[in-house]
Amino acid sequence: PTVDDGRPTDPERTLWVDMTLITVLTTLTIVPYLAASIQAPIPEYVAALVSSIIMVFSLLLRRDHPGALMALLLVGGLIQLIFVPFPVLSIIAVPIASYAVGRWTAGRQSRIILWLGTIGAILGPLRWRDTLAADYDSSGTPWVMWFLATTVCLGLVVTPYAVGRRLREAALIESQ
């Protein structure tokens, strides 16, 4: 007997879902940085634009090539970590990717996203700390802001992964 992980069987429907997702995310996460880069072409905005393009369009690989998705997401995240001192809207790609890797990747390989996501959830908010806490006194507020941002970022990695894993397990059990 073949084991089915529940992948969609209607290519036309998945194409429409993918195109809708990319169109919405492009509008929400790429267009603002494109406009900002045109108005004020500073390196931070250009890096935010480039990383957003990489992260959003990598989601097209989520069902068939989750490993490539993780690699491209890592590249986009590293660009943000190195060049952008503020949170970028395209981090919304992270929970979508985390779910996809949990859902469509077998075994231990799927847990790589948890390690990468945990590192990103710590380093990203650490990079943003000065920007997020710019209007607060330095007594302890910056570290509270970092802790809260880190907790939210960890939740955006772990929760979708767990949901994707459970759905994968349920589909595999049902197919047996």
Language model region names:
Residues P43-V46, P66-L72, I79-V94:
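Subset of alpha-helical transmembrane segments and adjacent helix-loop junctions
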Residues L60, P85-F86, W104, R165:
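Histidine kinase transmitter module recognition
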Residues L78-Q80, A121-I122:
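A short hydrophobic/aromatic micro-motif that marks alpha-helical segments and, especially, helix-coil
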